[in-house]
């Protein structure tokens, strides 16, 4: 199945000069959504995953069904102030400054094998901050899986050395 047929392209969103890749049509099509989830599950099957971690918000949309299919837990990564218990945080650079991500301080147990799942790999800032928090908690990042990679934005270089699965590539 060519999943690219289920990605909408919106020019100049969220700001002028940016091309936004919208996964909503993929999620709206049961066959395409199921196919994408199965592809990530297949990638994860031999990795002995204990936990899925997904950054908000689209990492939840992709990561939760993967966790369900694998029979493992899901740990959310969120912006500050969105998680109710003790958190750890990591900072990363965005185009116009520094941003922060958090996760519960007890989300990952030492030695747990973790798969990070998100919709998009662009510059790699979000996933790099997520890796930092997982490793700080003693987890082992067994892999990273994305629906889309935007080529030319150096996301792969940011997470060099980590096994990575991407279902589709688009120009960045």
Swiss-Prot record:
PROSITE patterns: PUR_PYR_PR_TRANSFER
Cited CDD domains: PRTases_typeI (cd06223)
NCBIfam families on file: apt, PRK02304.1-2, PRK02304.1-3, PRK02304.1-5
Pathways involved: Purine metabolism; AMP biosynthesis via salvage pathway; AMP from adenine: step 1/1
Reactions catalysed, as given in the entry: AMP + diphosphate = 5-phospho-alpha-D-ribose 1-diphosphate + adenine
GO molecular function, one term: AMP binding
Tagged with keyword Zinc: no
Places the protein is found: Cytoplasm
Covalent S-S links between cysteines: none
Family: Belongs to the purine/pyrimidine phosphoribosyltransferase family.
Catalytic activity, EC: 2.4.2.7
Major location category of this protein: cytoplasm
Function: Catalyzes a salvage reaction resulting in the formation of AMP, that is energically less costly than de novo synthesis.
Organism: Streptococcus mutans serotype c (strain ATCC 700610 / UA159)
Pfam families in the record: Pribosyltran
InterPro entries assigned: Ade_phspho_trans, PRibTrfase_dom, PRTase-like, UPRTase/APRTase
UniProt subunit comment: Homodimer.
Biological process per Gene Ontology, one example term: AMP salvage
Name of the protein in its database record: Adenine phosphoribosyltransferase
GO CC annotations on file: cytoplasm
Keywords associated with the record: Cytoplasm, Glycosyltransferase, Purine salvage, Transferase
Enzyme class: transferase
